[in-house]
């Protein structure tokens, strides 16, 4: 009975794979683009609540063809189809739907939704400003650098609040040189996606 009950509950969810690619990050051995962002999104079909889980890009996994490598290499090997096979093979999932975005797509989505309000640390502001230069060049979109506040004793403390445009929020997602390293980077990515989902729910149909 417990198994039947669990299966009944799980049918109320749809699971998607989300990939973020950087066209500059070519896998020279495989010839394609690595997916440096890999997120599994589980959507409650009734409430539309979204749960997100990140797969760290350097995780050693079976790419789905009995070849073991870093998880981000599956996309370079066979694009989204191979990356989904990798997730299904290693995590016992049955994902068939996915979305892939690059810098330009993400900045456009965020700008169309009017930007995002973000709580940040001093360290995040510094790194985001640095990444913005490159993100702006890649997308052709403008931004205004955030003026640094006085340096606090704890540069990792989240104590500043800013409204970010698409270039800034995308650059925020790229940060991986704070004390939390890649764990912090994936957490920031999930935070941005949750904000996008929340704003999309409340936006008019034209914006969605």
Residue spans for each PLM region:
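Non-catalytic, solvent-exposed segments at the cell envelope interface
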Residues: 1-208
């Amino acid at each position: 009975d417990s198994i039947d009950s669990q299966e009944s509950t799980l049918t109320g969810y749809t699971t998607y794979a989300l990939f973020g690619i950087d066209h500059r990050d070519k896998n020279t051995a495989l010839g394609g683009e690595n997916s440096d962002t890999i997120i599994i999104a589980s959507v409650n079909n009734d409430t539309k609540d979204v749960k997100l889980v990140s797969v760290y890009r350097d995780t050693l996994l079976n790419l789905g063809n009995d070849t073991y490598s870093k998880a981000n290499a599956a996309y370079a090997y066979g694009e989204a189809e191979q990356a989904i096979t990798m997730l299904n093979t290693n995590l016992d999932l049955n994902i068939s739907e996915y979305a892939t975005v690059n810098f330009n797509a993400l900045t456009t989505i965020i700008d169309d939704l009017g930007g995002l309000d973000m709580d940040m640390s001093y360290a995040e502001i510094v790194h985001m400003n640095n990444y913005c230069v490159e993100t702006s060049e890649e997308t052709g979109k403008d931004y205004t650098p955030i003026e640094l506040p006085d340096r606090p004793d704890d540069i990792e403390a989240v104590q500043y609040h800013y409204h970010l445009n698409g270039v800034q929020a995308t650059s925020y997602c790229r940060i991986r040189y704070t004390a939390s390293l890649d764990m912090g980077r994936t957490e920031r990515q999930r935070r941005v996606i949750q904000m996008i989902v929340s704003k999309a729910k409340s936006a008019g149909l034209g914006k969605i």
